[in-house]
């Protein structure tokens, strides 16, 4: 998972490797800090969040059914209320790879102030429309991108 967090320090030259070691010592099992670094960009420059979603291999048929749809309307809830968003405008096709007993897809969704789409909108839609349990999805956020699709650091 990709999480961005910030801390303030009075140290003039913080030892980020030491921070990483200390953080890893207190992380829950299975969660590892892979990078500690000074902030280079402001959070408001994030425009997309990218994910790797895996399902059991049998889900491939459902992903193909999604690909055949012309529209995929979902109701998005936010602080500003509810609105209908067509997932096909943001995810026209689900391109996936079969890996053993799973299928894996990678996608980037809007993650800006104006529009922020969570992958649970897709997994919920696939469950509601085709019966593919959302709980069978393994969702991993892998990175953030800026509006020009550069890696957010």
Task: Give the ranges of each region predicted by the language model.
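General structural signal for secondary-structure boundaries
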Residues: 12-16, 117-118
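Short beta-strand-to-loop capping motifs
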Residues: 7-13, 53-59, 107-113
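Short, glycine- and charge-enriched coil/turn segments that flank and shape catalytic ligand pockets
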Residues: 13-14, 60, 98-102
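RNA pseudouridine synthases
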Residues: 15-74
């Amino acid at each position: 998972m990709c999480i961005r967090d910030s801390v303030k320090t009075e140290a003039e030259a913080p030892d980020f490797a030491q921070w990483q070691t200390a953080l890893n010592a207190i992380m829950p099992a299975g969660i590892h800090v892979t990078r500690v670094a000074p902030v280079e960009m402001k959070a408001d420059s994030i425009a997309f969040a990218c994910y790797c979603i895996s399902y059991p291999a049998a889900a491939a048929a459902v992903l193909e059914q999604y690909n055949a749809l012309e529209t995929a309307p979902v109701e998005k809830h936010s602080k500003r209320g509810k609105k209908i968003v067509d997932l096909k405008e943001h995810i026209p096709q689900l391109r996936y790879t079969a890996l053993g007993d799973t299928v894996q897809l990678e996608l980037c969704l809007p993650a800006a102030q104006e529009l922020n789409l969570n992958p649970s909108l897709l997994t919920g839609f696939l469950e509601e429309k085709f019966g593919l349990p959302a709980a069978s999805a393994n969702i991993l956020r892998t990175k953030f991108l800026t509006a020009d699709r550069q890696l957010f650091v």
